[in-house]
Amino acid sequence: MDRDTPPEFRELLERAARLPKSIEPPRDLWPGIETRIAGKRPGKGETGREWVPWVLIPLAAAAILAVVLLGRRGTVPRGAWEVMRVAGLPLVGSSPLEATGVIRVGEWLETDDSSRAVILVGDIGHVEVKPDTRIRLVRALRSDHRLALERGEIYAKVDAPPRLFFVDTPAGTAVDLGCAYTLAVDSSGNGTIHVTGGYVEFAWGGRRSIVPLGFRADTRRAFGPGTPYAEDAPQALRQALAALDFSSGGPAAVRGALAAARSEDAVSLWHLLARVDPPLRRAVYDRLASLVPPPAGVTPEGALRLDRTTLETYWNTIRRIAWRKTILQGIRDIDPRTGTAR
């Protein structure tokens, strides 16, 4: 919490940090999930961080929204969203933002190095706009809540059915699946998405990644999203995935990724099943199966031909284990192979 945070914000954040609440996403969120990640790449081919209380991050952000709601305006014009100044002097278009205001479709909100703002995403959530950020309201429809992040960093929290909130970037689109996340884009159009609640789909062309709670994915202009990796993934795995996703890593990078992967990295290997060349797919499956045993109904033959039901069944097992491992970190010792307490 920085020195610019108003006292009322600090109080609400502190209260929110004491609320132990968490909900696992529903099972039926994932029909046909593998068809949304199996895009062909245009080219073939950080150190671990300390634990953070994942269940509290969205709640702390919700405290900021509570402050906004207390002072929100009455009627908002059609095709516009409410916006609130948090610090400094953000601009909406060319006009300085007062305490509260609106941003209309087509308008840009811009912050400098000392200003911040909060955008209310209709009635389904909010976006915290960090310093040095430029973001535009693209659509304000009930079925399509859409922003475009040109550069900078945002934190988004949405409580709504999947696929109602979108953030376009130069490297693709973040699609909300009931989630909270931080999205950063640099001046080159490259960036990172870090999911702190639920799941996010990041898509560019035919290439898609499903990023769960506690995972990150790098994004690159003209390449789209990289393979998701755990917050504490080994550096060797991150380097191998970067070579596969954004360079011509080839078989050597695949072997490097498989050698570095742990049971906690099953989400990454599951994505690789549909991303590597067919001759390498068996090695990926065998390594994945050794780290997280496949559930009933999952066979090597089905996985190798990218059968929809097979991959979805395996994914449901992998993502539940990852969810339990992340959400209970520091509370229970969860076996990363099975998701059960040890």
Positions of predicted regions on the chain:
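Short, low-complexity patches enriched in S/T/P/G
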Residues: K44-V55
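Single-pass transmembrane signal-anchor helices and their membrane-water interface zones
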Residues: R27-A38, P53-G79
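C-terminal non-catalytic accessory extensions
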Residues: A283-R342
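Flexible, surface-exposed loop/linker segments and immediately adjacent secondary-structure boundaries
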Residues: L69-W108, D112-D113, V121-P293, G297-P300, ...
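Acidic, Pro/Ser/Gly/Ala-rich intrinsically disordered segments
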Residues: M1-D4, T100, T340
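A short, acidic loop/turn at secondary-structure junctions
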Residues: D2-T35
